[in-house]
A protein has these predicted regions:
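Preference for intrinsically disordered or flexible, low-complexity segments
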Residues: 1-275
């Protein structure tokens, strides 16, 4: 969706005032369309299936439990779709998740329930690895596209926006239905199910349980860092891949803008939301 088409659709839905407030935060998203296949070509972007890992990397575990591969992204596949050149031009992103007890991302210990790895070395040193039996999803190839997006109504950026009653109706009955397709993507804005996540990432990643934060921990000097968090990857529930995140939820991989610029994926944070 182009910016002009985005504006036109918001106006058609009766959200002119929201567009006027949110247009400064419009971001480009790299959409990821899944197509189930028997075997994904080596080194290509996909959901589920096998991981093309460096030779000396072991399959990630949480104790005795193997993590499941949720997504492998070859950033070279994204070239031409990342309009602001935010992502690396090359390299592999791997996202693994504990499908037994991965947590919601609100507690510091939830860090053990996921792995986000980045490899930008020689492709010749990659080897296809399969998860232990019973711990993998059906493979689905990913095709990249692009669209422009406005912030979700409950995101950190729009926390001070005052919603009129008619705008609430317009959002849920018109806009949300218009954008209701499966939403796998890189970048853009998160499609929230249970509210904003930026502050949750800021707190939990710094060792502070989100629901138990004290008044002093919520002081502006610390919470200001919530604005640094960007959506890196969003994976929706998808019957085609056998992915059902606590029913019909979504997984969100977040990282700070300065970490993305430095290509430091070790500090990502993962949140699970479900209706």
């Amino acid at each position: 969706m182009t910016k002009s088409a985005l504006e036109a659709e918001l106006l058609r839905c009766g959200l002119r005032r929201y567009w006027q407030a949110a247009q400064v935060y419009v971001r480009n998203a790299v959409t990821l369309t899944a197509q189930v296949v028997d075997e994904v070509p080596f080194g290509r972007s996909h959901l589920g299936g096998a991981a093309d890992l460096p030779l000396d990397w072991a399959w990630p575990m949480r104790g005795d439990t193997p993590l499941s591969l949720v997504a492998q992204i070859n950033f070279a596949d994204c070239q031409g779709f990342d309009m602001n050149s935010v992502l690396p031009e090359r390299g592999m992103l791997y996202f693994f998740y504990d499908c037994v007890d991965g947590g919601w991302g609100s507690e510091p210990q939830d860090r053990d329930g996921f792995r986000v790895w980045f490899y930008d070395g020689d492709r010749a040193f990659l080897l296809r690895r399969y998860a232990p039996e019973g711990w993998n999803f059906p493979a689905a190839a990913l095709q990249c596209g692009r669209r422009w997006e406005i912030p979700d109504r409950e995101c950190w950026l729009m926390r001070d926006y005052w919603w009129e009653d008619f705008e609430n109706v317009a959002w849920w009955e018109r806009w949300d239905k218009f954008t209701g397709e499966k939403r796998h993507k890189l970048l853009g804005h998160s499609d929230n199910i249970q509210g904003a996540m930026e502050l949750q990432c800021q707190l939990a990643s710094h060792g502070i349980p989100y629901r138990a934060a004290t008044v002093s921990q919520l002081e502006e000097s610390f919470t200001a860092g919530a604005a640094d968090w960007l959506l890196l990857l969003q994976i929706d529930s998808d019957d085609r891949c056998g992915m059902h995140w606590h029913g019909n939820g979504r997984l969100y991989v977040w990282m700070r803008r300065q970490d993305l610029a430095a290509r430091d994926f070790s500090r990502c944070w993962v949140v699970l939301q479900s209706a």
